[in-house]
Structure formats: C-alpha cells, structure tokens
A protein has these predicted regions:
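Flexible, glycine/small-residue-enriched loop-and-beta-strand segment within the central core
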Residues: 1-53, 79-80, 85-88, 92
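Short, well-structured beta-strand-loop connectors
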Residues: 42, 60-61, 76-77
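Hydrophobic alpha-helical segments of small multi-pass membrane proteins
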Residues: 32, 62-65, 75
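Residue-identity detector for threonine
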Residues: 5, 24, 33, 58, ...
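Terminal amphipathic alpha-helical/low-complexity segments used for targeting or macromolecular assembly
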Residues: 81-178
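Beta-rich strand-turn-strand
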Residues: 45-59, 64-68
C-alpha cells in the first residue's frame, strides 16, 4: 500500500564506480536494498537511494532524497530527508488547516471564473459540509474507494459531524469571512 508519485526514482545501485574505473581500470560494483513499509506516500520527484528503509505510515515530501532509515509514523522532507513532524502532529495540523484551505479554494475559483465552484470541485473537503449518510454524490463516493479503504472511510465519515449543515451553509461562511 505505497503511493509513489510522478518522476520518483528508486536506486539500488551506484554508478559512481565509473570514476574509479577511469582512474584505475577497476570495476568496483555497488548495490544495496531498498525497503518501503506499508501505507507510505512518496512525493513527486523524490529520490530513494540504496540502503534506504522507510517505515510504515510515512509521508515523504516532494523532492526529498531518502538515505538510511526513516522511522514510521512520521513526515520527512528535504535533501537529505529529515523528520519534520510526527504523523500524529501532521494529522492535527491538517484538521486545523482544512477549513482555511477549502475557503481559499472557493475564493480563488470565484476570482478566476466569476462564479461559485460546483460542489464536486471540493471533493477533498466534502467532510466539511455533506450530510452524514452513504447516499453521497459519486465523486465523493470515489474518494472513499481510494486505497481500497471504503468501509473504514465510510464508517469514519458517518460517525463524524460536519462543520456546516450543507454546501450552501459553507458558501455563506466563505462569503461572511471575505
């Protein structure tokens, strides 16, 4: 259950021996293993080098260079990749930022297109305003189906409370906070 996004590379070898070969004629091969745990996200254009071990439940930011061992339940970024947050702290951060980012999305859409965005455009934010039932729009149902985690996502959704009573109530909030 690993998400490796566009333009990532995983290298289990090292061609730097070519310099040695040119200097001495020797071919001194170099290789190693790469281990990636379960429930890992690797951001775009990241590079995972030989000997890397990535623990379970790990997020790696875009453009990172992964070497050595990265413990699980954490967020890493940089070159070389360094721990920037526990996964728990990142989840708390996302819960706090979600509303502001949804508002920003609506404002940017309105500014660009001169009209309110269709509800379906906010497919990552529907937890903020959709009633708690399983009779959701197909676009939102598909979000549940990502990662073959439909049942767990639906259960979490139904057991949670929306911040707004409807999409219209959410849009009124956006208007009143402009």
């Amino acid at each position: 259950n690993v998400h490796i996004t566009a333009d990532c590379s995983i290298l289990q070898h090292d061609y730097s021996w070519a310099v040695i070969q040119r200097l001495t004629g020797e071919v001194l091969g170099s290789c190693g293993t790469v281990r990636i745990g379960n429930n890992v996200f690797v951001g775009q254009k990241s590079l995972i080098l030989k000997g890397a071990e990535i623990g379970d439940n790990t997020i790696i930011g875009a453009g990172s260079v992964v070497t050595g061992r990265l413990d699980g339940n954490a967020v890493y970024a940089g070159a070389p990749a360094k721990k920037i947050s526990s996964l728990e702290a990142y989840i708390d951060k996302r819960r706090k930022l979600q509303l502001n980012e949804a508002v920003l999305l609506v404002r940017e859409y309105e500014q660009t297109y001169g009209t309110r965005p269709p509800k379906k455009l906010l497919r990552e934010f529907f937890w903020l305003f959709e009633p708690r039932n399983t009779q959701l729009d197909e676009v939102f149902q598909k979000v549940f189906q990502l990662d073959n985690n439909t049942e767990r996502s639906q259960q979490a959704f139904v057991q949670s409370e929306p911040m707004f009573s409807s999409y219209e109530a959410f849009l009124k909030y956006v208007e009143s906070n402009s």
